[in-house]
Amino acid sequence: MNGRFQVLPDAIQVNLEHGETPADIVPVLSDAARLARERQLQNLLVVSGLGDPATAEAVSTALQEMQALGAPPARIAFVAYMFPQYSVYHFAESYAQKFGIEAKVHVSIRDAKDWLGVRQETPQTLPRG
């Protein structure tokens, strides 16, 4: 799975695309949470792209792993353009509450950034890993 990270002023953005199995998203989202913790950022912006194989089970596992890291992000904005992914990330909104994470699914990156309060500056792109 391709998971490209961008460091935004107030969040880590991860683009999920070209996955083979739902489990592919788990290490990508865990790495994003780890990077956010290292950078002392409280927000994740997860953008569902072409070939995002997310399922409710995989997202649940990813949220559990983020919690196990000891410092889950305070807020996660999911951006989904296709109904199957929108449905999965809509489920994640309520499931994330179990871990004290506020989550919301959006249909545009701009709306997601507004919800997170991310300032609009040039992001820094980082390779995953």
Task: Tell me what each language-model feature is.
Residues M1-G129:
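Amphipathic, Lys/Arg-enriched alpha-helical "gate/interface" segment within cytosolic domains
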